[in-house]
Amino acid sequence: KAYLGILGLTGITAYLGLDKIGKPKKGETLLVSGAAGAVGSVAGQIGKIKGCRVVGIAGSEEKIDRIQEKFGFDAAINYKTTDDMQKAIAEACPDGVDVYFDNVGGEILDAALANMNKYGRVINCGAISLYNKSEKPTGPRVETTLIKNSILMQGFTVRDFVKDFGPAQKQLAAWMEKDKLSYLETVVEGFESIPQAFIDLFDGKNKGKMIVVV
């Protein structure tokens, strides 16, 4: 099962997103949205291995506790109980944000950009907050922010780095052997469970990787 999750595309996505775009350095602050999810939880743990201060964004108190207690995040924000995300990020990241691993897009991305440091890096890995929108949402224009702070914001599709899958998987396995990485999975049985499992992903009901056994 690990090869369907942390040693598969899930872990490889987190690893290569940080390695190729985020390039976190010791002492920097890494912010991760969708932090309790399969990719986000691994990204946060890799950030800790790299010596970063890691802050996660998730959507329930249970998830907030999980990413701090199980995955070692330094701080966490529950976006569902936060009225002002920009302020919440500023408080959780008093030294600003150097790397933002974005799995959700939308208003949370806007709030993160407002807290980015000079030469910050944004990894646009997902936009789950927008996938079910019938109309394209509007938001702040980001050009001035990107220019003023020399921020790199890059869309990321793991398929662009197929040649790097082997080395990434090898490094992830080495960290697992040293107990530096943990993971969770939600396993449901039966082909007929696939539609509900897919819906549960968008409702955030899964813990880590969603796996359907048929």
Language-model region placement:
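Terminal helix/beta-alpha structural elements that buttress the NAD(P)+-binding lobe
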Residues: 1-214
